A protein has these predicted regions:
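Conserved beta-alpha
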Residues: 1-268
């Protein structure tokens, strides 16, 4: 049996942790990154409110959805017409629908990757609404330092597209209890990665701990030696560069599917 290391940010990992516990799987949270709001909150809020006149908003993650609605606050009730809102997967769709209900926002069109395509930027770009050459205005809501494939592809297709960073990814604090749990585990490790940023941040955090904390300093080689479940080929390539060997790409980013696949891999 493997110990599952969940590197998702704490703000988005509760459902997965609960699913893993219900399956009676040994698991520990070791977030690679945390989510923070923008540094210039008022400026970003003003830009966001001005952008309600645009045709489409694209949320690149659940974090983008949560931070956007946090920035909108009471302003959502004062606006009668909203752009079409696009998401990359079913988890994000459910999250967006929940926030729309909470804010009393009705009649908002939601688009997502069509059936049979991946829950990703590439999948969303296959949607017919984003295939047509158009001068529609599109706002991509994300964090600094992400991929620019969406932006460049939409601009190449003739859309008037721009980005707005509504949140930041910052390194998470290493929790001593989590470090100790992994250090004390005598068996193999199975790590879930949900972003390339988490991989880089956690590597930096654990390498920086070499001198200050001997236990934490030993973790990175052990983690790399174990098994890995990644969400994308991009994460797989990065893990290979960091000397990971056994890397499986998840069938789906959906929480229940991840829990089921982790259960299968943990018992293998």
């Amino acid at each position: 049996m493997h110990l599952i290391i969940n590197t998702r940010p704490e703000s988005t990992s509760a459902a997965l942790q609960q699913a893993l516990q219900q399956l009676h799987l040994p698991c520990v949270q070791l977030p690679g990154m945390a989510i923070a709001g923008p540094q210039q909150v008022q400026q970003v809020r003003s830009q966001l409110l001005a952008a309600v006149q645009q045709d489409v908003w694209i949320f690149t993650s659940i974090n983008a959805i949560e931070q956007t609605f946090s920035l909108l606050a009471e302003a959502s009730a004062a606006t009668s017409k909203w752009p079409t809102m696009a998401v990359l997967g079913q988890g994000s769709r459910h999250c967006l629908q929940r926030f729309l209900r909470q804010h009393g926002m009705t009649g908002v069109d939601i688009i997502a990757p069509p059936a049979g395509s991946s829950s990703s930027s590439e999948g969303l770009l296959q949607h017919s609404r984003l295939q047509q050459v158009s001068d529609q205005r599109i706002l991509i809501l994300n964090a600094p330092g992400g991929r620019d494939k969406l932006l460049t592809t939409l601009q190449q297709r003739g859309f008037v597209a721009e980005e707005l960073a509504v949140y930041r990814r910052v390194p998470a604090r290493l929790e001593p209890a989590a470090v100790q749990t992994i250090a004390d585990w005598g068996g193999d490790l199975l790590t879930l990665w949900t972003s390339s940023t988490s991989i880089r941040f956690l590597q930096q955090q654990l390498h920086a701990s070499n001198e200050a904390d001997a236990e934490a300093g030993k973790l990175w080689p052990r983690i790399m030696h174990g098994r890995h479940l990644a969400l994308s080929a991009r994460q797989q390539r990065l893990l290979k560069q960091l000397d990971a060997v056994t890397i499986i790409i998840a069938n789906s980013p959906d929480t229940n599917n991840l829990a089921q696949q982790l259960q299968e891999l943990a018992g293998a």
